[in-house]
Amino acid sequence: MSTGRWFRPRTIWLPTWRVWLPLLLGTILAGGWVVTNVHAWLSVTAPVEDAKYVVIEGWVPDNVVREALDWSNKHGVKRIFTTGVPMDKGEYLSAYPTYAEMCASTLKRMGADSSKIQPAPAAAVKVERTRAMAMGLKQALDMEQIPAADRKINLFTSGTHAFRSRMHFRRALGPEWQVGVVSVPSPGYPPADWWHYSEGVKGVIDEGVGIAVQCLSP
């Protein structure tokens, strides 16, 4: 049976080991660089030093809230905003309908001046919760009628969520606001060895995917 009707011989040029070896070494080096640097890149800390406003993502653990309060006391912050979507667990047991209000109450229990605390609840959403929280903050800030010269705010969040959170809040508040960020390390693992812990690996993967989705979103 002749195969000439259906198949034709072709010559394929393949790289030799002199090509494959540098490619393999380059891949290994690039992978090593990613492993050692990606966590720090996602956990960015770049505050606006003279900002008089702070926002805390309400879902974060208490060590982040404490860090934000200490920062606010040290830097003479005028107002602390707390963001958060409606509670998705324990709403029948909790006195707080949203994470924003729960975080605000936590601040008060920690000794914060209640006159400086302003919850900024977000709408109930299934996806893009960080974006919803950023929009909730924008609505609260618009009601404050803050002078243009004072439109500087620092965002406090947990670990690897910092980079993506800052992207959302910058986009929501627009160019008239300077948005800084402070990433407080998770108490669950040491950042330098994040790949040894399931929480660290999950955080890096989740945030990497989230950033990719956000970059592709209109």
PLM regions with names:
Residues 5, 77, 200-201:
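A generic structural signal for solvent-exposed, polar alpha-helical segments
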Residues 11-13, 85-88, 204, 212:
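Amphipathic, soluble alpha/beta structural segments
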Residues 4-45:
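N-terminal type II signal-anchor transmembrane helix
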Residues 39-196:
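A structural signal for short, hydrophobic/glycine-enriched beta-strand patches
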Residues 195-218:
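A transmembrane-helix-recognition feature enriched in membrane-embedded lipid enzymes
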